[in-house]
């Protein structure tokens, strides 16, 4: 029979020596039961051993003696930011888009971002006119980091500020996008802010530029130089009177007052819109300047009629880009226009098609969906 001699545990034993003994007895993966047995054999307290093994703990009641201290630190560091890559290693500067054309309020928005001053900015305008894209490209041109948050009725403090997350049986604080932007000195873009509920009021102190106290963990976050907030919306925070933007809400007056400046974003002028569509057309591998010019003239007439109250729908710049792209795919004007305006009701769709027929003398008006399919 093999005889085992149990030696008294040396209280001055190093962590390396203790780990080596544990490996010899139980292997590299050990449990609470293994440690308790080891403590009983060596007349040592459970707390003393687990303290030595703290860097090797992988989950509750489990240790892996092959895990290095560096690996553990790397794992812990990865949970300090919303992504797996540590915040300091991420690049949040948007890419420059070759299809972008500056127009309207873009120079002013760019100046605000370039100043690195804390100057909350509210941008309002109809759908598809480049509000968000303009902010993104201003940051791209200036090399500024941008964190975009799409606001919904469900967005709350946990989504914006952060909260505790359950990781390997432990609760770990997880920064939200607002804290990330504060600490990085980035531009925080609150997209479609008029969809928010009253839970958005958790940003009141942030909109004053004074930082934010995280009451759940007792830490105050100072805003880094360059931090700013830009909000975009289809309304001015007073709801949608005509019902075009269902889901938008009336925002708190005190909240809106914290935005010192508001820009009203309009659709680009005819000349600018032609230039913009040419850029997109080139990126799609299509070159038909005549078609682009007719499309812009058509959209301009529709918008003027909309502003005068003659119709309830309009063609956005984004919709024109959709049509140009559809044209590069289907190689047919009628089909490209029709499939891109099918989202409107039949009466509106028919009136839009008839109007384009008047704008473009060479256009062949389709009679039915079936006839378009045959073209």
Role assignments for model-derived ranges:
Residues 8-30:
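Positively charged, polyanion-binding regions of nucleic-acid-associated proteins
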Residues 28-39:
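Short acidic, hydrophobic short linear motifs in intrinsically disordered regions
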Residues 4-5, 29, 74:
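Generic short N-terminal amphipathic or hydrophobic helices
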Residues 37-43, 48-54, 59-60, 65-375:
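C-terminal regulatory/interaction module of P-loop NTP-utilizing enzymes
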